[in-house]
Amino acid sequence: MWKFVIGSVSTAAFFVSVCTIYFSVSMLDELDSFRLSIRDELEDWKEVSDDTWQRLNDMTSRNVPKKTNILKEFVRGKRNVGNDQCNCAEPTKNCPAGPPGEKGSLGNPGQPGPDGVDGDNGVDGDVVIHDMPNPKECIKCPAGPPGPPGPPGPLGPRGDKGPSGPRGALGDQGETGPVGEIGDQGPPGSAGRAGPRGQAGQPGTIAIVGLAGRPGPQGPLGEPGAQGEPGVDGKDGALGAPGRKAENGRPGKRGKDGVAGVPGTRGKEGEDAGYCTCPPRTA
């Protein structure tokens, strides 16, 4: 049972891992394609904005009339102080912007004209201090095209610990597990506390002794009683008359051999019998 459950869980985890890797690779591919498309669109937009900016500069330089001031070269104006003043062109008044015309081709340089007739002497001029326009009324230059995206910044500091999340919902009740094996017998428990004293009983009724009834029927035969103790020996009886002579009995069995006796003393030497003498030795 457990082996089947573990195998099923392992197989499911393997398939989930494979699916996760596949979708991660697909997502990275889509993000790369999206990044390339965004970069192409930004380059197209940059080209359009650069072209528009060039056309605006050409229109401004072509439509704004040039004003010459003879005294400007000899009179020193006030210096610009601060960063609020811009270096844009002088403002034009009552000059509506016309529609942009098509850019023509460059013509050939013309021949230098003849020298003009000397003019009359002019009136002595006064020293004029040229005031710059009020910085608050300075012309706002149009914003340039957006630059390319900068490199990713460094990793920021670790944020504060967020608040604790809400407590999760109560899970469903699990299935009842199989009945376990019977455990070993535990040690005897300690004696319980004495129970409370019972309530007093109700008062009994006064009994009235009735008349004796008729004797009942004879009961069944009871089981045999236990064996009694042996009785006391009786007194010896009177001596009886002698009996008749009995016949001889059968011979008894042979008894066992007795223990060996002590060895006797050596007897005296007997006399020589009629033996011949032995011949002498030859060798």
From Swiss-Prot:
The protein, known as: Cuticle collagen 49
PANTHER family: COLLAGEN (PTHR24637), CUTICLE COLLAGEN 49 (PTHR24637:SF231)
Quaternary structure, from the entry: Collagen polypeptide chains are complexed within the cuticle by disulfide bonds and other types of covalent cross-links.
Keywords annotated in UniProt: Disulfide bond, Repeat, Signal
Compositionally biased residues, Pro residues: 143-155
Reported phenotype of the disruption mutant: RNAi-mediated knockdown causes dumpy body shape. Defects in cuticle integrity.
Chain segments carrying region Disordered: 90-283
GO BP annotations listed: collagen and cuticulin-based cuticle development
Domain spans labelled Collagen-like: 213-271
Family: Belongs to the cuticular collagen family.
Residues spanning the signal sequence: 1-19
Species the sequence originates in: Caenorhabditis elegans
